[in-house]
Regions:
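Alpha-helical transmembrane segments of multi-pass inner-membrane proteins
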Residues: 118-145, 170-214
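Aromatic-anchored transmembrane helix interface
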Residues: 64-68, 83-106, 119, 123, ...
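Hydrophobic cores of alpha-helical transmembrane segments in multi-pass inner/ER membrane proteins
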Residues: 35-43, 96-105, 177-189
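N-terminal signal-anchor transmembrane segment
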Residues: 1-51, 71-79
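Membrane-interface micro-motifs in multi-pass membrane enzymes
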Residues: 25-35, 89-90, 163-183
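Structural signal for the C-terminal ends of transmembrane alpha-helices
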Residues: 41-53, 78, 103-115, 187-196
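Membrane-interfacial loop-to-transmembrane alpha-helix junctions, especially the N-terminal start
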Residues: 1-10, 52-67, 116-123, 198-202
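Juxtamembrane membrane-water interface segments that cap and precede transmembrane helices
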Residues: 15-25, 154-170
Length: 214
């Protein structure tokens, strides 16, 4: 029972990370940002447990590249006299994404006792299928639609103007891009990990059809 609850929480956290949204009560702070904040606590604890804690080399290199992108963005803004600051805080966005991912993967590892690419992919696939069902249910049930809109802000309302279905933090370009990525992930698993997922191929195919259709 405890493991089942842990898996359900893992699915919810995966959705919070992959399809972040804001609560109306906390404008400006989405679920991914909150998870990134939690990652600082986890990281501080883990570094404190090590006698010779060091910064990961790959993380350092990625941070330098992100800072360079932000610097180039600043230079182009000044040179071209524009106000497009889309990439000015790119390095912060990268840290938030990585921080949120760190919290999620540490929780999944805690629940399952291990961590693998396949396991993470399975959670992402499950979340996308879940979002499809939520979007469809909201489209045919005004009560559920109103309930969700009553406490979600930001991306929760994307899609209403176009009359399209939308999930929880999942709509328009956000949904299209990430659903496409997950469809490619399913194909990749079927082609390259057949021996390990042979028993579950029907489930992967059903997930593919649900995501493609809805």
């Amino acid at each position: 029972m405890i493991r089942f609850i842990g898996i359900i929480l893992s699915i919810l956290l995966t959705s919070f990370y992959f399809f972040p949204f804001e609560f109306l009560a906390l404008p400006g702070i989405n679920t991914k940002m909150a998870m990134a904040g939690v990652s600082l606590v986890i990281l501080a604890f883990q570094l404190g447990m090590k006698a010779n804690a060091v910064i990961d080399k790959d993380f350092f290199n990625l941070s330098i590249l992100a800072l360079l992108i932000s610097l180039i963005s600043l230079i182009t803004m000044v040179y071209n006299n524009t106000e497009d600051a889309s990439f000015l805080t790119y390095f912060i966005s990268m840290w938030v994404w990585l921080g949120g991912a760190y919290t999620l993967t540490q929780w999944i590892k805690f629940v399952h006792g291990k961590l693998s690419v396949r396991l993470c992919c399975n959670y992402l696939i499950t979340v996308c299928v879940f979002q499809c069902f939520v979007a469809y249910a909201m489209s045919i049930n005004p009560v559920l639609d109103g309930f969700v809109d009553s406490f979600l802000g930001g991306e929760a309302f994307m899609g209403r103007a176009e009359g399209r279905m939308y999930g929880i933090g999942c709509a328009l370009d956000v949904a299209g891009l990430r659903f496409s990525t997950i469809l490619i992930t399913i194909v990749f698993l079927l082609m390259n990990d057949y021996a390990h997922i042979k028993k579950y191929i029907p489930l992967y195919l059903v997930a593919f059809l649900i995501i493609t259709t809805i």
